[in-house]
């Protein structure tokens, strides 16, 4: 039975229960533009609620997309009072973790400290794990009024602008990575604890550190439960209409399904819609022919997905006003004949 799903993200934008939205795909397909557009539409459609857009990609682009500098602290978007952005720095998170370890044990000769440093640098996915720990820390500590520790912002939905596919999939494997890390630490604590004490290691400091790791694991396990609940979490795939991008999208969807994560929306960017051009160039016609071929394949392969088709514009999509104009096609399908003027009316930033 063929499903006739709406080719927009309107159901996602209007869903009341979503707490987490991940946006990911191959590098260079427009993930940041898409995640920014989703965040803008959420803020516009629900002005009474607060939203947070987080970049976990080391090559941050949110500042460029909004023409506004963001950092590791959540900052309000100028022109949208209920949307905040932040850019997570894994290197800074690693440095913070090492500093915290030194606070628990300031003995430079403690062998456990050296072992821990080697382990945290060698376990696959540790960068992504640290990024997520940083996310949890900032969400927990974010306040409406910095002078009132009890008055915290309650974000209706948090949107993740993720790194290219491989990093994103490791990011979503975070709970197992942390469990592996914590298990090794606990094993070392049990086997080497007495020896560390004999060598001068601070048993009390080590115990405090392991208790903190247990707390982190508990918090992450709770978030992981939410990640596998389709009422709370969904993943939006972003691609372009080319073979390699389609192949990568299918691979990513299969992996996401293995994590039991909900994914039912695909945004296809940079479409030319050359059939409706009054004076199309030969190169545009040729590329549009190729794009249509892969669009047809996607329509057949993902008939039970919301397949959103977004146009290639004549300029970069930067700034809140341009994002507002572009993002409306997440809610209402782009019409090449009626909406053609949008391609040239965007203001360069």
Curated annotation (Swiss-Prot):
Please give a single GO biological process term from the UniProt record. tail-anchored membrane protein insertion into ER membrane
Tell me the residue numbers annotated for binding Zn(2+). 281, 284
Q: Which UniProt keywords apply?
A: ATP-binding, Cytoplasm, Endoplasmic reticulum, Golgi apparatus, Hydrolase, Metal-binding, Nucleotide-binding, Transport, Zinc
User: Known InterPro entries for this protein?
Assistant: Anion-transp_ATPase-like_dom (IPR025723), ATPase_ArsA/GET3 (IPR016300), ATPase_ArsA/GET3_euk (IPR027542), P-loop_NTPase (IPR027417)
Q: Where found in the cell?
A: Cytoplasm; Endoplasmic reticulum; Golgi apparatus
Q: Which residues form the active site?
A: 57
* Pfam families in UniProt: ArsA_ATPase (PF02374)
Q: Does the keyword Kinase apply?
A: no
In its UniProt record, a GO molecular function of this protein is: metal ion binding
Using the UniProt record, give the first listed, main subcellular location. cytoplasm
Q: Which residues hold ATP?
A: 26-33, 242, 269
Please indicate if the UniProt record lists Transmembrane as a keyword: no
A GO cellular component annotation in the UniProt record? Golgi apparatus
Q: What's its EC?
A: 3.6.-.-
Family per record: Belongs to the arsA ATPase family.
The record's note on quaternary structure and interaction partners says:
Homodimer. Component of the Golgi to ER traffic (GET) complex, which is composed of GET1, GET2 and GET3. Within the complex, GET1 and GET2 form a heterotetramer which is stabilized by phosphatidylinositol binding and which binds to the GET3 homodimer. Interacts with the chloride channel protein GEF1.
Physiological role: ATPase required for the post-translational delivery of tail-anchored (TA) proteins to the endoplasmic reticulum. Recognizes and selectively binds the transmembrane domain of TA proteins in the cytosol. This complex then targets to the endoplasmic reticulum by membrane-bound receptors GET1 and GET2, where the tail-anchored protein is released for insertion. This process is regulated by ATP binding and hydrolysis. ATP binding drives the homodimer towards the closed dimer state, facilitating recognition of newly synthesized TA membrane proteins. ATP hydrolysis is required for insertion.
HAMAP family linked to this entry? Asna1_Get3
Specify the protein name: ATPase GET3
């Amino acid at each position: 039975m063929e499903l006739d799903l709406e080719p927009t993200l309107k159901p996602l934008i209007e869903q009341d229960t979503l707490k987490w939205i991940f946006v990911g795909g191959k590098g260079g397909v427009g993930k940041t533009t898409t995640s920014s557009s989703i965040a803008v539409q959420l803020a516009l459609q629900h002005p009474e609620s607060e939203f947070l857009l987080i970049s976990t990609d080391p090559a941050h682009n949110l500042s460029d997309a909004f023409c506004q500098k963001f950092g590791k602290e959540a900052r309000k978007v100028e022109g949208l009072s209920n949307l905040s952005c932040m850019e997570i720095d894994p290197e800074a998170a690693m440095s913070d973790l090492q500093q915290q370890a030194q606070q628990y044990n300031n003995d430079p000769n403690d062998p456990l400290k050296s072992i821990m440093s080697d382990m945290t640098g060698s376990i696959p996915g540790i960068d992504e794990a640290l990024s997520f720990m940083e996310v949890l820390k900032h969400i927990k500590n974010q306040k409406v009024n910095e002078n009132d520790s009890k008055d915290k912002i309650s974000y209706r939905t948090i949107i993740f602008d993720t790194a290219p596919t491989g990093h994103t999939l490791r990011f979503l494997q975070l709970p197992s990575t942390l469990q592996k890390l914590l298990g090794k630490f606990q094993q070392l604590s049990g086997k080497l604890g007495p020896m560390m004490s004999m060598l001068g290691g601070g048993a009390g400091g080590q115990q405090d550190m392991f208790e903190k790791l247990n707390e982190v694991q508990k918090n992450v396990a709770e978030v992981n439960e939410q990640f596998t609940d389709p009422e709370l979490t969904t993943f939006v795939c972003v691609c372009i209409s080319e073979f390699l991008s389609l192949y990568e999208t299918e691979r990513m969807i299969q992996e996401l399904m293995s994590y039991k994560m909900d994914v039912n929306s695909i945004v296809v960017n940079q479409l030319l819609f050359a059939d409706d051009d009054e004076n199309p160039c030969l190169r545009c016609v040729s590329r549009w022919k190729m794009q249509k071929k892969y669009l047809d394949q996607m329509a057949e392969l993902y008939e039970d997905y919301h397949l959103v088709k977004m146009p290639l514009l004549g300029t970069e999509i930067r700034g809140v006003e341009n994002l507002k104009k572009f993002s409306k096609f997440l809610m209402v399908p782009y019409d090449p004949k009626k909406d053609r003027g949008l391609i040239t009316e965007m203001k360069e930033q």
